[in-house]
């Protein structure tokens, strides 16, 4: 399938101005000045799209999404629905990192990894963190490093809550251990080993992060 987007305003991410974009299958093969590209009439499977008054950008990366739904802090009826590929891509998100929030009980790591795999199968790039607000971290295997090392979709730990009334109020030693275990998992797997932190409005502020 060949697609030609004509006369579209491109940010790549730098501003390129009005251009034509030629796409073959799922790859951009050429970007040229507006009006300079065309598809020969003898190509049976082709589509031309008028990009006038439209903007084309790379897909956005959203590194904190409750793909299983959020909420629940006001009771069971307060839970929000799962994210969908259509809902994400509608707003230009093509890479997503899923996480659990306050509720690591009604939603768990098995469900989060399964949801992440499903989004990947649908065509979006999807990853996730191991854990939720709580410390000790509830992992899928028996450890943070093992989760990150052995499960393709898991790239770090989170969302760990600090300085928040919904947090487990981790000590400095506990928070340091989470950081060290996440770092180890990243080193062993060749991943970044990210820690995603939820920071509330408590008086401790960023104290734990600064000390670590």
PLM-predicted stretches and their roles:
Residues 51-114:
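Metal-associated gating/positioning segment near the N- to mid-region
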Residues 8, 26, 53, 64, ...:
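Divalent metal-coordination and catalytic microenvironments
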Residues 5, 47-49, 61, 97, ...:
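Hydrophobic/aromatic beta-strand patches that form the interior of the parallel beta-sheet core
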